[in-house]
Curated annotation (Swiss-Prot):
<keyword id="KW-0689">Ribosomal protein</keyword>
<dbReference type="Pfam" id="PF01246">
    <property type="entry name" value="Ribosomal_L24e"/>
</dbReference>
<comment type="function">
    <text>Component of the large ribosomal subunit. The ribosome is a large ribonucleoprotein complex responsible for the synthesis of proteins in the cell.</text>
</comment>
<dbReference type="InterPro" id="IPR038630">
    <property type="entry name" value="L24e/L24_sf"/>
</dbReference>
<comment type="subunit">
    <text>Component of the large ribosomal subunit.</text>
</comment>
<comment type="similarity">
    <text>Belongs to the eukaryotic ribosomal protein eL24 family.</text>
</comment>
<feature type="compositionally biased region" description="Low complexity">
    <location>
        <begin position="123"/>
        <end position="140"/>
    </location>
</feature>
<feature type="compositionally biased region" description="Basic and acidic residues">
    <location>
        <begin position="96"/>
        <end position="117"/>
    </location>
</feature>
<dbReference type="GO" id="GO:0003729">
    <property type="term" value="F:mRNA binding"/>
</dbReference>
<keyword id="KW-0687">Ribonucleoprotein</keyword>
<keyword id="KW-0963">Cytoplasm</keyword>
<dbReference type="InterPro" id="IPR056366">
    <property type="entry name" value="Ribosomal_eL24"/>
</dbReference>
<dbReference type="GO" id="GO:0022625">
    <property type="term" value="C:cytosolic large ribosomal subunit"/>
</dbReference>
<dbReference type="GO" id="GO:0002181">
    <property type="term" value="P:cytoplasmic translation"/>
</dbReference>
<dbReference type="InterPro" id="IPR023442">
    <property type="entry name" value="Ribosomal_eL24_CS"/>
</dbReference>
<feature type="region of interest" description="Disordered">
    <location>
        <begin position="94"/>
        <end position="157"/>
    </location>
</feature>
<dbReference type="GO" id="GO:0003735">
    <property type="term" value="F:structural constituent of ribosome"/>
</dbReference>
Length: 157
């Protein structure tokens, strides 16, 4: 079974249907029906007529199911060294057990507290001597006389 295509609309023409039109220059056209033939002879552009295949192709109609979904690029995790720490050090820290990490943290906190105490101990004697000299130089505070409000005039409000 030979199926032809309509020269105007682009639809299939099955055997026993359609019309054949031969021009004087020898070119042969197949039309699905009289509607297509008359539109062709009136020199209408099939790309501007809504129901033709050429129009649908031009305006991208009905191709949504054929189009494959666009692939989005996925972010891939990649491990590399950071300034001040090599990759081996980072991996070693990551693979440590939580108990070991907790012990290290507590030790670091203890060391920081001790250094803070040592700093304060060096500061205290100097600060204490400064305070004693300041206390002797202070003047005694004099109590300010309180203002006594004047008696109200005009009776009951």
């Amino acid at each position: 079974m030979k199926v032809e295509l309509c020269s105007f609309s682009g639809y299939k023409i099955y055997p026993g249907h359609g019309r054949r039109y031969a021009r004087i220059d020898g070119k042969v056209f197949q039309f699905l029906n009289a509607k297509c033939e008359s539109a062709f002879l009136a020199k209408r552009n099939p790309r501007q007529i809504n129901w033709t295949v050429l129009y649908r192709r031009k305006h991208k109609k009905g191709q949504s199911e054929e189009v494959t979904k666009k692939r989005t690029r996925r972010a891939v995790k990649f491990q590399r060294a950071i300034t001040g720490a090599s990759l081996a050090e980072i991996m070693a820290k990551r693979n440590q057990k939580p108990e070991v990490r907790k012990a290290q943290r507590e030790q670091a906190i203890r060391a920081a507290k001790e250094s803070k105490k040592a700093k304060q101990a060096t500061k205290k004697p100097a600060a204490a001597s400064a305070k004693t000299s300041a206390k002797t130089a202070q003047k005694p505070k004099i109590a300010k006389p309180m203002k006594i409000s004047a008696p109200r005039v005009g009776g009951k409000r």
